Regions:
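Membrane-spanning beta-strand positions in outer-membrane beta-barrel proteins
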Residues: 8, 12, 23-27, 59-63, ...
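Outer-membrane beta-barrel architecture
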Residues: 14-16, 27, 50, 142-144, ...
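Solvent-exposed loop/turn segments connecting transmembrane beta-strands
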Residues: 7, 36-39, 290-296
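Structured alpha-helical segments in the cores of large, soluble enzyme domains
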Residues: 7, 11-17, 264-274
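Surface-exposed loop/interface segments of Gram-negative outer-membrane beta-barrel transport/assembly proteins
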Residues: 1, 35-37, 46-138, 156-264, ...
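Phosphate/anion-contacting hairpin/loop surfaces
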Residues: 300
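Predominantly transmembrane beta-strands of Gram-negative outer membrane beta-barrel pores used
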Residues: 2-3, 10-32, 36, 48-54, ...
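Transmembrane beta-strand segments that form the barrel wall of outer-membrane beta-barrel proteins
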Residues: 28-34, 280-292, 327-329
Length: 384
């Protein structure tokens, strides 16, 4: 009797056009999902636009995607006091018709109407008065271009950026048994983020006689930040039904974080082969990471590999069709986490009698930390 009929709708419209020099496409979609629980629904909106153009040796491609998602309540599932079905099956039983408690207030915003006044909550009260809502927006964009300098040489650039914003609110009214605070509760958080990744490549691929070579040189810029803040009431709400930080009985609890990182890179690769028998690959990369101290911020890591198809050089017995020798030497390095070398106090608010505390980490890291590094070697063979 508590569950409702769920349904999903999906609507989409799209437009596209193709011409002599390029194409264009755009689409808009909306998904609505009505769940089986009261006050359970999800909306998703997606809009995308993109296209490409080509003028002789020059070509471009780009586009953007926007996603929006919002719902009024993400609670109600699972085992425990906040689970609707758990409350109904374990603690209610068949002696009660839950529909008799659809009006879940005895006293508006202060006392819920339920057959159990000690342990668990009215499922209708949970669905409407103990909620966790979210509103999320994200944009993805990309752009790339390529120019064919010569038949065997080209230059390309690519860039992509992502941005998001999210807002979450949690609340429970007074008289909650299984909520966050029986005297009322309100929580709000906001977070935003952005990332960018762009690179430029000069690539070549050429053959002459028995030899073939290809490779590239390029550079990349990666940037990222994330900013978040959250606050919640403490020890209840001073005004029933008023969900605001201003209604907190005691001073609110708050926390915030900010993360930022940038990595600049240059790299290259050279590959050569002779008669499709002998192969050599050499790669090299140098990164500069903002998470490392200035003295060790730049780090270089190369790799070399090669192989020889012996069955192309030597006469093989009848039972051996293919034989290859291979070897490789590789160095990989990676930077540290954000703030690993810039430690700060850990602050807690309203710890005792309204006072805050600040604790410094017990482990102090060196200011000349280097990136993590790993070296690997490989020698092998393959035959059949």
């Amino acid at each position: 009797n508590f569950l409702e009929t769920g349904f999903i709708t999906n609507n989409n419209i799209s437009i596209s056009q193709t011409g002599k020099y390029g194409s264009f496409r755009s689409s808009l979609s909306h998904v609505y999902n009505k769940g089986q629980y009261p006050n359970q629904r999800l909306n998703k909106i997606t809009y995308s636009v993109g296209g490409d153009m080509k003028f002789g040796k020059l070509s471009f491609e780009g586009g953007a995607i926007y996603n929006k998602r919002f719902y009024p309540n993400g609670e109600g599932a699972g085992y425990g006091g906040g689970g609707y079905i758990y409350n109904l099956l374990v603690w209610t039983g068949t002696d009660y018709d839950v529909r008799d408690y659809k009006n879940y207030w005895r006293k508006k915003d202060e006392e819920q109407n339920w057959m159990n006044d000690v342990w668990y909550d009215n499922p209708y009260y949970l669905a409407h008065e103990m909620t966790s809502s979210n509103d999320y927006d994200k944009v993805n964009t990309y752009l790339s271009g390529k120019y064919d300098i010569m038949p065997w040489l080209n230059f390309s650039m690519r860039a992509g950026a992502d941005a998001y914003a999210s807002r979450t609110e949690k609340k429970n009214a007074m008289s909650a048994r299984g909520g966050w605070d029986k005297n009322g509760y309100f929580y709000t958080s906001k977070s935003t983020g952005f990332s960018f990744n762009g690179d430029a490549l000069l690539s070549a691929n050429h053959s002459f006689g028995d030899f073939a070579i290809d490779g590239f040189v390029g550079g990349t810029i990666y940037y990222y930040y994330d900013d978040a803040i959250s606050s919640n009431t403490r020890n209840g709400l001073s005004i029933p039904g008023y969900y605001s930080l201003k209604a907190s009985v005691d001073p609110i609890a708050s926390s915030s974080s900010y993360k930022q990182k940038q990595v600049n890179s240059i790299y290259g690769k050279f590959s050569a082969s002779w008669k499709s028998t002998v192969f050599v690959d050499v790669t090299a990369r140098n990164d500069w990471s903002s998470t490392l101290p200035s003295e060790t911020r730049s780090y270089f890591y190369p790799a070399v590999s090669g192989s020889i198809i012996m069955s192309q050089l030597l006469k093989m017995p009848e039972w051996l069709n293919f034989w290859k020798l291979r070897g490789a030497w590789t160095v990989t390095k990676s930077d540290l986490g954000i703030y690993d070398t810039n430690q700060a106090y850990s602050v807690s608010t309203n710890v005792w009698d309204g006072m805050n505390t600040a604790v410094y980490p017990e482990m102090i890291r060196s200011t000349t930390l280097e990136p993590t590094a790993a070296r690997s070697y490989e020698i092998g063979t393959a035959f059949n």
